[in-house]
Amino acid sequence: MAAIPSRKGVVVHINVFTVAPEKQQLLVDSLIETVNEARKVPGWLSARVHRSYDGTRVVNYVQYESQEAAQAVLRHLAAGGYLKRNTELGTVAPGQYEVVYTLDSVAGLQT
């Protein structure tokens, strides 16, 4: 399991998508493609894609080194049509956050 650092300056975007169950996997695949493109931009740190068991939600969790890096990634993805495609597959409720605390199981961090 990847650690989520709580260091100063790291910007976190958590996007919660509501999606029709028949489109959930399409959105998951699209978000995976999107984060693989995003990782090419300096300042991008990490991403996670989660799907709900009931098929109606997908959550995308992304970390950036700074606000500037987050904006650069979003501009890059918008120019490539990634953001438009994702929002055509589901309705997104975006949010920007700062990590203030993390706690991990020692066993969960072993590889």
Describe the residue ranges of each PLM region.
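Short amphipathic alpha-helical/adjacent loop interface patches that line ligand
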Residues: 31, 35
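Short, low-order "capping/linker" segments at domain edges
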Residues: 99-111
